């Protein structure tokens, strides 16, 4: 029997995802038409004998999360539970705190996945690899190759070329260490908890020496820095390298990039989710997802890489490219939306142009992963995608370029390179 844990973080996390994470917990933000973590859950549901998925985070349980989990449970026919940490315990502290729940029923192994990654989730291949590399006494990290500069933003892995044993692990190194990076997807045998316990005991000893140390601080454990770094070179930690697509979803810009990856996967995994040009329907270019309840005028042109949410209205002559349009939004006649996320219930007026600058990886470099982009560099706003928060209104005939508009704003003129509060 197997299980899976998805680390979903909490409200103080995902700051680079604002203002979109004000409205919906980031793990539920739609990527290629479905909530970000649904992609993880679906991948888990295809692993034979995977009996339970545990989401661990520090969000207060809420209506959106509960109803999503209920629906996903029914759709994917797997037990799913949310376990709430009393505060942020780190990527290792949460699983250690809930170790009894994870181990109940006696799983032979369990996956742990960061919620904010986009992947093909080669979980079955990871299982096979795990069996061939130590089984019950070993742990597997999914790795991929990045270019030298970008590797510095990730956990870097030095591995034995023949055995794939992890010899050295450094999280976000200051100088180049390795081009193999940690994808935030792991397969652990239950014995991993002995190693996390060592870190916990060490924290306890160190903190006992300090006055006013709290129980909570002892429980904060980072899998990457505290556990992987010490396990490396001890014949227990292995890297399974994937050639499949992978990216992180840190900023809103990277959500558009991740949408593109998932939409292209739909070609093989979910062709029914991809729209096509049909008699009497809009013109579709490349991969486009349209929610069945959306109302799209036949003269609109959509794509590539467009996701249209529930109840969205796309009027006559509208052009949309490389964008995510969230539920309830209205794009009026002849408006143009490029490299933008249009927030829930927002309105783009007639002939308005809303445009951002993509923050894609270098298209000529296959090993270039999307970076955690910075909004400001040298005190200046760097060109980014445009984001309209929830319930924003853009008047007719204006241009909004590389800007972020906070929720509930009614604009009256054009803006360029601004955060509109
Ligand atoms: P940054 O670039 O600083 O964001 O680092 P990172 O990519 O290593 O990400 P981080 O470790 O912050 O988060 C990785 C994943 O774990 C994300 O999906 C987070 O939501 C989740 N996560 C981070 N901290 C916690 C925590 O304290 N508890 C839980 N349950 N999840 C967490």
UniProtKB/Swiss-Prot annotation:
Sample GO molecular function, one term: GTP binding
CDD domains per record: M1P_guanylylT_A_like_N
The enzyme's E.C. designation: 2.7.7.13
The encoding gene: gmppa-a
PROSITE patterns: HEXAPEP_TRANSFERASES
InterPro entries hit by this protein: GMPPB_C, Hexapep_transf_CS, Mannose-1P_guanyltransferase, NTP_transferase_dom, Nucleotide-diphossugar_trans
Name this protein carries in UniProt: Mannose-1-phosphate guanyltransferase alpha-A
Pathway: Nucleotide-sugar biosynthesis; GDP-alpha-D-mannose biosynthesis; GDP-alpha-D-mannose from alpha-D-mannose 1-phosphate (GTP route): step 1/1
GO terms for biological process, alphabetical: GDP-mannose biosynthetic process
Keywords linked to the UniProt accession: GTP-binding, Nucleotide-binding, Nucleotidyltransferase, Transferase
Catalytic activity, as annotated: alpha-D-mannose 1-phosphate + GTP + H(+) = GDP-alpha-D-mannose + diphosphate
GO cellular component: cytoplasm
Gene3D superfamilies hit by this protein: Hexapeptide repeat proteins (2.160.10.10), Spore Coat Polysaccharide Biosynthesis Protein SpsA, Chain A (3.90.550.10)
Family indicated by similarity: Belongs to the transferase hexapeptide repeat family.
Short name of any one Pfam family annotated for the protein: NTP_transferase
EC primary class: transferase
Superkingdom of this protein's organism: Eukaryota
